[in-house]
Curated annotation (Swiss-Prot):
GO cellular component: cytoplasm
Catalysed transformations (reactions): 5-[(5-phospho-1-deoxy-D-ribulos-1-ylimino)methylamino]-1-(5-phospho-beta-D-ribosyl)imidazole-4-carboxamide + L-glutamine = D-erythro-1-(imidazol-4-yl)glycerol 3-phosphate + 5-amino-1-(5-phospho-beta-D-ribosyl)imidazole-4-carboxamide + L-glutamate + H(+)
Protein name: Imidazole glycerol phosphate synthase subunit HisF
EC primary class: lyase
GO biological process, one term: L-histidine biosynthetic process
Family: Belongs to the HisA/HisF family.
Role: IGPS catalyzes the conversion of PRFAR and glutamine to IGP, AICAR and glutamate. The HisF subunit catalyzes the cyclization activity that produces IGP and AICAR from PRFAR using the ammonia provided by the HisH subunit.
Keywords, in A-Z order: Amino-acid biosynthesis, Cytoplasm, Histidine biosynthesis, Lyase
Molecular function GO labels: imidazoleglycerol-phosphate synthase activity; lyase activity
Record pathway: Amino-acid biosynthesis; L-histidine biosynthesis; L-histidine from 5-phospho-alpha-D-ribose 1-diphosphate: step 5/9
Protein source organism: Hahella chejuensis (strain KCTC 2396)
Length: 257
């Protein structure tokens, strides 16, 4: 048996509240981040990802205070992203109680930053977040482009090539979000997930599009993901973490029960 596949609830945090939108817009409130994280920890989530979704866009640093509160209440690994631009930001987050940091926009502008971060803090705590959109026309070979600033700015970078490059620089994990699928609840972009999973040697977390428990299974079995990330199906009570794990186990996916 390989390593157990992880289920990771994602908390998109805007001005201190957990929110969830569709394709990065049309936002709904989902509660206090510390309360939400605590609930997932108690339910048996494998990890929590906390993304300050306004940080990169508005040039505001991630809310250290919220991370400290969360880390004091949550005992599973915590990944924090949003506005991580320099080594000092990483140190601050790790000191606040984060186990890993997620770098997105800064990695695109200064890829060397990922290398410096991995050298200083270790690859195991450096996650590179990739927001990708399909740009190929029907009938063409499938291509995906990287977007930054919460999905607002195209970069011209190919997602698969970029993922490989980030791992060469020292990323210990790739958090891969399909922006076409984000919040749409029609499943992960499995072709994208599989292409990146096959291209890199580090764990890939599939994100964007979970609408039911079968989608989680598909992300692992068809997409080749090592972990699956979801937000709205958990935040709004459609499914619980134990239900998700039981369903995945029944479908032959190894999970930590």
């Amino acid at each position: 048996m390989g390593l157990a596949k992880r289920i990771i609830p994602c908390l998109d945090v805007d001005k201190g509240r957990v929110v969830k939108g569709v394709q990065f817009v049309d936002i709904r409130d989902a509660g206090d981040p510390v309360e939400v994280a605590k609930r997932y920890d108690e339910q048996g989530a494998d990890e929590i990802t906390f993304l300050d979704i306004t940080a990169s866009h508005e040039g505001r640093d991630t809310t250290v205070h919220t991370v400290e509160r969360m880390a004091s209440q949550v005992f599973i690994p915590l990944t924090v992203g949003g506005g991580i631009r320099k080594l000092e930001d990483i140190r601050t987050m790790l000191n606040a109680g984060a186990d890993k940091v997620s770098i997105n926009t800064a990695a695109v502008f200064t890829p060397e930053f990922v290398g410096e971060a991995a050298a200083r803090f270790g690859s195991q705590c450096i996650v590179v977040a990739i927001d990708a959109k399909k740009v190929s026309a029907p009938g063409e070979e499938e291509r995906w482009e990287i977007f930054t600033h919460g999905g607002r700015k195209p970069t011209g970078l190919d997602a698969i090539v970029w993922a490989r490059k980030m791992v060469e620089f020292g990323a210990g994990e790739i958090l891969l979000t399909s922006m076409d699928r984000d919040g749409a609840k029609n499943g992960f972009d499995l072709a994208l997930t599989r292409a990146v999973s096959d291209a890199v040697s580090v764990p890939v977390i599939a994100s964007g599009g979970v609408g039911n428990l079968q989608h989680l299974v598909d992300g692992v079995k068809e997409g080749g993901a090592d972990a699956v990330l979801a937000a709205s199906i958990f935040h709004f009570g459609e499914y619980s973490i134990p239900e998700a794990k039981a369903f995945m186990a029944k479908q032959g996916v190894e999970v930590r029960i």
